[in-house]
């Protein structure tokens, strides 16, 4: 029995694809690390879908290879990528999302990737990553997501923090507690349970963070009085 298992292990090693490691460098500073796999039938003359898998809280860019996502990608002729996101507890803050965006761009510059077929998947903290990235990146001139799947993903960071009586990782990366910087918790969440009408900020890619915050605050003030305004109008 042991001999058979050992043989199967050797076969799996022989059949597995090479995993490459790359570093995201901006202005001579190493910002992040990510790994990727090229399918065995890769053809640079045709475009290939890209599957991005995100690690769970406490994981890293290699954690996703303990799943079957990489194998499924290889079987389908898809390129597979797994980002670190700057830290093992990043909770998909804006900086981590920017890293992922730049890593996708690097992959597009170095491999023939179908920009209309970029998919994201993950579990727990990583399960929400694709949904959060999709919500925050709607500029058609930059990498967008065609579809995303979440396994037990953390959907509402504000609710999660409240239920945990605070979350040190979120405080670290969002810049404060849920009641101090609610905007950061909302835009780094997949949804906002309290009111689905407020679930996502309006994505205006050319506004800076300050403008985003003003817009978010204005929307939150206006939403409760819209029904009254509608009722009073002739």
Residue spans for each PLM region:
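Active-site-adjacent alpha-helix of alpha/beta-hydrolase-fold enzymes
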Residues: 172-180, 203-205, 210-234
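Alpha/beta-hydrolase active-site loop
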Residues: 91-111
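A domain-start/cap signature at the N-terminus of enzymes
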Residues: 16-48, 125, 166, 183
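Short substrate-entry loop that stabilizes the transition state in hydrolases
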Residues: 42-92
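Primarily recognizes the serine-hydrolase "nucleophile elbow" in alpha/beta-hydrolase
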Residues: 109-110, 116-166
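Mobile cap/lid helix-loop segments that gate and shape the active-site cleft of serine hydrolases
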Residues: 153, 158-208
């Amino acid at each position: 029995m042991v001999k058979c298992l050992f043989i199967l292990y050797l076969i799996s090693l022989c059949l597995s694809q090479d995993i490459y490691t790359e570093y995201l460098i901006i202005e001579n500073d190493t910002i992040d690390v990510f790994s990727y796999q090229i399918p065995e039938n890769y053809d640079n003359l045709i475009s290939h879908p890209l599957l991005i898998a995100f690690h769970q809280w406490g994981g890293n860019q290699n954690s996703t290879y303990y799943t079957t996502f990489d194998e499924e990608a290889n079987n389908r002729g898809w390129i597979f990528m797994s980002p670190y996101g700057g830290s093992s507890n990043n909770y998909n803050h804006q900086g981590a999302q920017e890293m992922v965006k730049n890593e996708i761009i690097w992959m597009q510059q170095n491999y023939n990737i179908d920009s209309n077929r970029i998919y994201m998947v993950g579990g727990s903290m990583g399960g929400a990553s694709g949904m959060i990235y999709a919500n925050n990146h709607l500029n058609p001139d930059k990498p967008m997501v065609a579809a995303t799947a979440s396994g037990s993903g953390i959907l509402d960071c504000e609710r999660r923090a409240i239920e945990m009586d605070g979350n040190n990782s979120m405080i670290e990366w969002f810049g404060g507690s849920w009641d101090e910087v609610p905007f950061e918790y909302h835009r780094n969440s997949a949804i906002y349970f309290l009111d689905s009408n407020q679930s996502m900020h309006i994505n205006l890619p050319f506004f800076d963070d300050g403008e985003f915050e003003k817009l978010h605050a204005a929307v939150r003030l206006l939403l409760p009085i819209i029904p009254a305004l509608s009722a009073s109008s002739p």
